[in-house]
Amino acid sequence: MSFGPLVTAGWLREHIGDRDLTVIDFRWHLLGPDGRDEYLRGHIPGAVFVDLEAVTGTRGGGRHPLPAAWQVQDEMQKAGVDDGTKVVVYDDAGGSVAARLWFLLGWFGHGAQAVLDGGMRAWGEPLETRIPSVVRGAFRSRPPDRTRILDFEAVQLLEGVPLIDARAGERYRGDSEPVDPKAGHVPGALSAPWVENLRADGLFKSAEELRDRYFSLGVEEGAVVYCGSGVNACHDLLAMELAGVPNGRLYAGSWSDWSHHDAPVATGKEPG
């Protein structure tokens, strides 16, 4: 039976004690509280904390380069993950951070990973502060599919392929830019803020609604997505998979890479 890319809070409540399940708390905030501190104050029972920075590389453009295979392998082993383990990842940010680990696990060949739909908000049960005792797992990273990753040079050469900007509309338009040196977007990019993949209650929209959203933008198989640093873009990649638009690709360095180059910048609500 296939697993993922989403599980409901009801499913997790039913399976929380399964021996072949690992729950990972992946909370992180760009300009907010420390995720580990939040984990220590309370987390889903049995959940193990994994820090975004621990699965972020040191080579490549942007603020959050993709990790080396050994980094993901080591962190997953420390979390108790084996090759056959189902992994559920959650955050408190609508899945916009958890989707990054979902993407990385798939990219490194795990194949049994899911995001908790609605995250902490949907859990709705008591939290615990006890740190679980974990037996080191035997997870092994497989060689990643490099065709799903684009760098600055590859994005410059894109022709006839939709380029999607997953950031908030104000950052796309260039009205504000909280962290990077330039405001605006990559010329030609279409605005598809990740938050619009969600309903008002914080759950993902239906597959049909997501399909309508992305097809109306002209998104097709092989579309490229970017955000600020390659984290939140994975939310759009997950939504595209739910919508039946497979093989989405990631501009890993995203705007934090593009804006540091001597490259053209578009502003306003049009792609430019």
Model-predicted regions and their roles:
Residues 1-8, 14, 120-190, 262-272:
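Active-site neighborhoods of enzymes that stabilize oxyanions during catalysis
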Residues 9-37:
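Hydrophobic alpha-helical membrane-insertion signals
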Residues 12, 47, 105, 189, ...:
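Terminal peptide-recognition signature
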Residues 15-17, 208, 246-252, 256-272:
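Extended hydrophobic/aromatic segments used for targeting, binding, or gating
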Residues 23, 47-49, 113-115, 163, ...:
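Conserved beta-strand scaffold positions in the cores of enzyme catalytic domains, especially
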Residues 57-86, 193-223:
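Helix-loop module immediately N-terminal to the HCX5R catalytic loop
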Residues 63-158, 175, 231-254:
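Thiolate-centered catalytic microenvironments shared by cysteine-dependent enzyme domains
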Residues 227:
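Short cysteine clusters
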